[in-house]
């Protein structure tokens, strides 16, 4: 007696598009995690200890927002489904804040610290959190096939690794190519912000199955 074949829900290109979502995420996460301190201390001349304290305070807010957005996504019912609206809105905010984070205006040092904290918190605790929680939830929403879920995770990991490697080798070179200093960082951040937004839009075409509501 042969085993029953598990139903499949996704085409190969949908799996690829889903995995590419981690490329979009790492365009922002990778740039901030690996290079924002270099920009803030090396180019802007800000104090690393103060920056570290501001980041720590922001992480507290980030932990709170995880719960909030998880609840909001679960309660969302729209034409795009539960997850995709938050992924779209979140990525727009991520891309905007990523550019602004590497475009700190000239002025008093105090105002620069305030500017950094506000933009950094908006990026991480609001928009990135909304996008990433929705992105993770999308796996369970688009397929019930366990093998496909594993494949989605593999595609996601592959794109994350590739993106981090490429960024590790290219970011400082791009900064220098575009003039170095504040202008170089600003242009480089803009490039990755646009890439992240464009790639994230590919996920909008992955449909969440319509769920029937049974009235007893």
Model regions and ranges:
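Membrane-embedded alpha-helical bundles of multi-pass transporters/translocases
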Residues: 2-207, 211-212
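Hydrophobic alpha-helical segments, chiefly the membrane-spanning helices
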Residues: 215-216
